[in-house]
């Protein structure tokens, strides 16, 4: 069972109303963080999708609000954001490496709180491969419940609702904090 460990502190206790982050900016931020620190670090398309999902899911679970504009569908290989899928679809396959050259914005500007939150999630999930993150998501209630009675290999484009993420990751966060 994987969940961020304690240590985020009061970062998100402040409820500040700001403009919603773009999913493309968060995508570019993750690419830049991973590849700037180690340009040989693996960041395949599958892994990027799962990292984006966990940033959004934990934001809902901890803060009860989204980190960025965007939703995730319960696809065969785990949660996928269709907009980011479409962004890379013409040049990248599921297991294709994503590189700094794939960034749309090399100067992403996020609030310090949002950057710290994303870094916190990356600290906890970057150590896993795309396949491991896929398996993790397949064992979690939001993906399972969204797919319902579908076989694991059946196509699905149902959206994983914010309510499911708030419920599941919120409970996990309360367990971590206690």
Describe the residue ranges of each PLM region.
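Single conserved hydrophobic/aromatic residue that forms the stacking wall/gate
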Residues: 1-15
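Domain-edge interaction signal
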Residues: 14-178
């Amino acid at each position: 069972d994987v969940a961020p460990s304690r240590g985020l502190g009061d970062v998100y206790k402040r409820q500040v109303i700001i403009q919603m982050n773009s999913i493309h900016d968060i995508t570019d931020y993750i690419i830049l963080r991973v590849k700037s620190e180690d340009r040989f670090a693996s960041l395949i398309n599958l892994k990027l999708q799962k990292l984006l999902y966990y940033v959004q899911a934990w934001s809902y679970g901890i803060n009860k609000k989204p980190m960025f504009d965007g939703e995730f569908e319960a696809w065969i290989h785990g949660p996928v954001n269709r907009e980011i899928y479409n962004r890379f679809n013409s040049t990248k396959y599921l297991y294709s490496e994503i590189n700094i050259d794939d960034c749309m914005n090399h100067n992403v500007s996020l609030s310090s709180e949002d950057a710290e939150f994303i870094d916190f999630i990356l600290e906890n999930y970057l150590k896993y491969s795309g396949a491991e993150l896929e398996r993790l998501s397949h064992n979690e209630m939001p993906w399972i419940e969204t797919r319902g009675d579908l076989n694991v290999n059946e196509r699905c484009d149902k959206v994983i609702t914010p309510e499911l993420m708030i419920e599941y990751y919120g409970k996990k966060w309360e367990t971590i904090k206690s």
